[in-house]
From Swiss-Prot:
Residues 248-331 are cytoplasmic. Expressed by all (resting and activated) natural killer cells (NK), T- and B-lymphocytes. Increased surface expression on T-cells of systemic lupus erythematosus (SLE) patients. It is found in: Cell membrane. It comes from Homo sapiens. It holds the Pfam family V-set. The modification Phosphotyrosine is found at Y274, Y309. A motif (ITSM 1) lies at residues 283-288. The keyword Membrane applies. This is SLAM family member 6. Disulfide bonds join C147-C214, C153-C195. The ITSMs (immunoreceptor tyrosine-based switch motifs) with the consensus sequence T-X-Y-X-X-[VI] present in SLAM family receptors have overlapping specificity for activating and inhibitory SH2 domain-containingbinding partners. Especially they mediate the with the SH2 domain of SH2D1A and SH2D1B. A 'two-out-of-three-pronged' mechanism is proposed involving threonine (position -2), phosphorylated tyrosine (position 0) and valine/isoleucine (position +3). The lineage of its organism: Eukaryota, Metazoa, Chordata, Craniata, Vertebrata. Residues 35-120 form the Ig-like V-type domain. Keywords: Adaptive immunity, Cell membrane, Disulfide bond, Glycoprotein, Immunity, Immunoglobulin domain, Innate immunity, Membrane, Phosphoprotein, Receptor, Signal, Transmembrane, Transmembrane helix.
Length: 332
């Protein structure tokens, strides 16, 4: 319990009038890499014997050390959360391993001697090692063959401590992750654009070729244009075939209708044959149509013999039989 008593005695004995005030000190900025180790350096007063050292983290006691000239120092870790990851050098500088994001904060070392006290302040930042830098692009090709590039740079797990900039030929073009440039192959030579991502512990870079990106866009534009041309051609061919079929069908219907209209009443009458059957007292007419049959008009000649056949009645009554001369008289 001696170390605890001495620590409390140090806190109460060295007030604002006996130590350097916190407001007048500039903390030392120390950057640590997530998962790795960091050391907070400690300097001793020259020519003075150190009684004890207290390490604080965010104003909470972290460790209490009592140096000895003839034996190993007494080291008492007062923060169990960081106890297994704490270590001290021969000069009692603090080493913190397997860094975590929660280790970020303010650290202080209070060194007590017989005549004075020294306060060292630190600000520890835990940063991620940058990795997996990528550049995405959205390119557009105009009709005048000018290529417009929209470039975006990114890294994995980026935070506010990561900065981006774009460079070309050693000149900084932008201090943002986004860059928009126009490139004309007719007047511009091959140009590379480099994105640089960095934080306090690491940096990455990635370069892209404007010529390569624009060539890819041109190929895509040509392929798209060819596909549209082929689709348009196929649609035109199918439309022409459908239109041709409609015209042929309409023409066929018109020819059929015209043929029907050219047949006059006389030809229609000639194409009809009537058969008269008179069973008993009823008469039944039947007609047979001979479409498109060629019919010759019969013209009687002088020497032709005209024969008329009488209708046979199937009734039992006997009909008188007329002679050929009588029949001819009746016709006349």
């Amino acid at each position: 319990m001696l170390w605890l008593f001495q620590s409390l005695l140090f806190v109460f004995c060295f007030g604002p009038g006996n130590v350097v005030s916190q407001s007048s000190l500039t903390p030392l900025m120390v950057n640590g890499i997530l998962g790795e180790s960091v050391t907070l350096p400690l300097e001793f007063p020259a020519g003075e014997k150190v009684n004890f050292i207290t390490w604080l983290f965010n104003e909470t006691s972290l460790a209490f050390i009592v140096p000895h000239e003839t034996k190993s120092p007494e080291i008492h870790v007062t923060n169990p959360k960081q106890g297994k990851r704490l270590n001290f050098t021969q000069s009692y500088s603090l080493q913190l391993s397997n860094l975590k994001m929660e280790d970020t904060g303010s650290y202080r070392a209070q060194i007590s001697t017989k005549t004075s006290a020294k306060l060292s302040s630190y600000t520890l930042r835990i940063l991620r090692q940058l990795r997996n830098i990528q550049v995405t692009n959205h390119s557009q090709l105009f009709q005048n063959m000018t290529c417009e590039l929209h470039l975006t740079c990114s890294v994995e797990d980026a935070d506010d401590n990561v900065s981006f900039r774009w460079e070309a030929l050693g000149n900084t073009l932008s201090s943002q992750p986004n860059l928009t440039v126009s490139w004309d192959p007719r007047i511009s030579s091959e140009q590379d654009y480099t994105c640089i991502a960095e934080n306090a512990v690491s940096n990455l870079s990635f370069s892209v070729s404007a010529q390569k990106l624009c060539e890819d866009v041109k190929i895509q534009y040509t392929d798209t244009k060819m596909i549209l041309f082929m689709v348009s051609g196929i649609c035109i061919v199918f439309g022409f075939i459908i239109l041709l079929l409609l015209v042929l069908r309409k023409r066929r219907d018109s020819l059929s209708l015209s043929t029907q209209r050219t047949q006059g009443p006389a030809e229609s009458a000639r194409n009809l044959e009537y058969v008269s059957v008179s069973p008993t007292n009823n008469t039944v007419y039947a007609s047979v149509t001979h479409s498109n049959r060629e019919t010759e008009i019969w013209t009687p000649r002088e020497n032709d013999t005209i024969t008329i056949y009488s209708t046979i009645n199937h009734s039992k009554e006997s009909k008188p039989t007329f002679s050929r001369a009588t029949a001819l008289d009746n016709v006349v």
